[in-house]
């Protein structure tokens, strides 16, 4: 039971927890807002990491070590950004699973914008994974970008353009850093559209009850 008369005297966190929400939705509806929180954390930590990062194949790994060892609270920024990315994907897969289970895909505009968001997010994560330029980064960059060569006629040209040459080298890392930096802004824009489209029709109603049943 929520005593609405006393809500004005409660702490902000308590007010947030007591936010009146219809009984016809559950905890599974929290993950959209959790994703926005993850996005804000990633952009904030990513900005401070980008200040100290060097997009050069000879210095990239050393710059990551420098961030972790020498930059004040750099180790927190680096770990939060890395672990936050994993949390981001956990939240988004639960968010998608809820949508599939409850039939949110019937709201086509919201679903298509969300699918596009997932593709951009996966691309952003891939570019970020390459940036430390360790052994696994180099392997990932080589294997994943080589998939472009499977595209008929244009594949080899696209791969050469993405690499900035005939092999993965310094221009590749520079391009990946630029893409990793710019794509989150595309995610912000598309997330805004995703939310606007959602509130245009409203979320689905899993129990089939009246929205104002409470």
Curated annotation (Swiss-Prot):
Superkingdom to which the source organism belongs: Eukaryota
Keywords annotated in UniProt: Electron transport, Heme, Iron, Membrane, Metal-binding, Mitochondrion, Mitochondrion inner membrane, Respiratory chain, Transmembrane, Transmembrane helix, Transport, Ubiquinone
Subunit structure: The cytochrome bc1 complex contains 3 respiratory subunits (MT-CYB, CYC1 and UQCRFS1), 2 core proteins (UQCRC1 and UQCRC2) and probably 6 low-molecular weight proteins.
Residues binding heme b b562, per UniProt: 81, 180
Full protein name: Cytochrome b
Extra information: Heme 1 (or BL or b562) is low-potential and absorbs at about 562 nm, and heme 2 (or BH or b566) is high-potential and absorbs at about 566 nm.
Record's cofactor remark: Binds 2 heme b groups non-covalently.
Entry binding sites for a ubiquinone: 199
Keyword Kinase: no
Predominant place of localization: mitochondrion
Disulphides: none
Molecular function terms, GO-annotated: metal ion binding; ubiquinol-cytochrome-c reductase activity
Pfam families (UniProt xref): Cytochrome_B (PF00033)
Membrane topology per record: Multi-pass membrane protein
BP term (GO), one: mitochondrial electron transport, ubiquinol to cytochrome c
Annotated transmembrane regions: 31-51, 75-96, 111-131, 176-196
Localisation per UniProt entry: Mitochondrion inner membrane
Entry's Gene Ontology cellular component terms: mitochondrial inner membrane
Family recorded in the similarity comment: Belongs to the cytochrome b family.
Chain residues that bind heme b b566: 95, 194
Keyword Protein biosynthesis attached: no
Function noted in UniProt: Component of the ubiquinol-cytochrome c reductase complex (complex III or cytochrome b-c1 complex) that is part of the mitochondrial respiratory chain. The b-c1 complex mediates electron transfer from ubiquinol to cytochrome c. Contributes to the generation of a proton gradient across the mitochondrial membrane that is then used for ATP synthesis.
Cofactor(s) listed: heme b
